[in-house]
């Protein structure tokens, strides 16, 4: 598979070869759904907590005798039926992460890249070695591409990162950090030639 090779100014500088095993994978949206749920679950802090009957401060004394009052028997004022009592089966601090097979995660990355390629939303860059230090300069470069949001994947320098940091529609990521959620969350995915080699070693 052959596609145009461009620079950040959208000037054609040659052609690049795309591996069909990565960019022509069979579309299974259910796998993308599973992977996105898995990624979002990993991001959850899990710091939710309510106080149960053992956490609520208060007396441990039995409020009144078991018999002869005519009222329902009670053993603690910290019980959930009382005002200020504990919460039954409330959330506790825990991890929301769960395991997902490596093969499924690899296949999901192929599906996401193939989906973007089918929709003409993949751009191959020759490199990220461009003399851009200001946000205004980066904005001019990005305006050459007619998309609403960009995920730039490659080995970028500090100057490029600083120039793009204040653009909410541009995100930079290293090849090792490429993931399904970020791919689907941006309209256009920009990959460098070195990133293509990294993907072949990672996914094949």
From Swiss-Prot:
Q: Does the keyword rRNA-binding apply?
A: yes
Similarity field: Belongs to the universal ribosomal protein uL4 family.
Q: What does this protein do?
A: One of the primary rRNA binding proteins, this protein initially binds near the 5'-end of the 23S rRNA. It is important during the early stages of 50S assembly. It makes multiple contacts with different domains of the 23S rRNA in the assembled 50S subunit and ribosome. Forms part of the polypeptide exit tunnel.
Report the superkingdom from the record: Bacteria
Region annotation Disordered: residue ranges?
49-76
Quote the Gene3D superfamilies the UniProt record gives.
3.40.1370.10
Q: What are the annotated GO cellular component locations? A: ribonucleoprotein complex; ribosome
Protein name as it appears in the record: Large ribosomal subunit protein uL4
> Which organism is this entry from?
Wolbachia sp. subsp. Drosophila simulans (strain wRi)
Q: Which UniProt keywords apply?
A: Ribonucleoprotein, Ribosomal protein, RNA-binding, rRNA-binding
Family annotation (SUPFAM superfamilies): Ribosomal protein L4
